[in-house]
Curated annotation (Swiss-Prot):
Disulfide bonds join C64-C106. It holds the Pfam family Cucumo_coat. This is Capsid protein. Its main location: virion. InterPro entries: Cucumovirus_coat (IPR000247), Cucumovirus_coat_Asu_sf (IPR037137). It comes from Tomato aspermy virus. The lineage of its organism: Viruses, Riboviria, Orthornavirae, Kitrinoviricota, Alsuviricetes.
Length: 229
């Protein structure tokens, strides 16, 4: 019996060592998880400014409908003070603009922040009268009248906010390519100065194909090589 007692006592340190090993393993797992999260954040920041199949993400989010393609625009907001707004009308390049009667089905807006971005902005797309001036005073009220969806995008400590795009359905208003100049992208800088190099906004306009774009770029197998014509 004494020997059994001694044997039982000798096993206790081994159980303790196993517990220590488990604790060490848990600590290593936590450290590895933290490192993985940090690497993923850095990868997200790096990929946000590098061309890829996700850039712009219209292709990744959905395919064009049959008979449609898309035209991409890049908007770089100028320096915008806190509580001030920026606006820019959609200017369609040639040869697409030479076919004003082609239908537009939707417009997708995607935000691509630089690593320096650390504030909150509101973004929307509005149809405005040609006489409307896109000054800060005129633009701000467009975010609060409830007549259009607004994307609220903010810096988060863990990395880039995943909800960085918004799609506006244009088919229900019968929009055409010739109407796009009546629409403006508007940006409101809510809680800090938005510097000129902190944000690029990609706009993908899905519209009926035109003769010079025989092949839909949404269906191309080399999407990352296609440039806006």
């Amino acid at each position: 019996m004494a020997q059994n007692g001694t044997g039982g006592g000798s096993r206790r340190p081994r159980r303790g060592r196993r517990n220590n090993n488990n604790n060490n393993s848990t600590a290593r797992d936590k450290a590895l998880l933290a490192l993985t999260q940090q690497v993923n954040r850095l990868a997200n920041i790096a990929s946000s400014s590098a061309p890829s199949l996700q850039h712009p993400t219209f292709i990744a989010s959905k395919k064009c409908r049959a008979g449609y393609t898309y035209t991409s625009l890049d908007v770089r907001p100028t320096r915008t003070e806190k509580d001030k707004s920026f606006g820019q009308r959609l200017i369609i390049p040639v040869p697409v603009s030479e076919y004003p009667k082609k239908k537009v089905s939707c417009v997708q807006v995607r935000l691509n922040p630089s690593p320096k971005f650390n504030s909150t902005i509101w973004v929307s797309l509005r149809r405005l009268d040609e006489t409307t001036l896109l000054t800060s005073e005129n633009v701000f009220k467009l975010f609060t009248d409830g007549l259009a969806a607004v994307l609220i995008y903010q810096h988060v400590p863990t990395g880039i906010q995943p909800n960085n795009k918004i799609t506006f359905d244009m088919s229900n208003v019968g929009a055409e390519i010739g109407d796009m100049g009546k629409y403006a992208l508007i940006v409101y800088s809510k809680d800090d100065v938005l510097e000129a190099d902190e944000m690029v906004i990609h706009i993908d306009i899905e519209h009926q194909r035109i003769p010079s774009l025989q092949r839909s770029r949404c269906d191309s197998t080399r999407m990352h090589d296609v440039r806006r014509r």
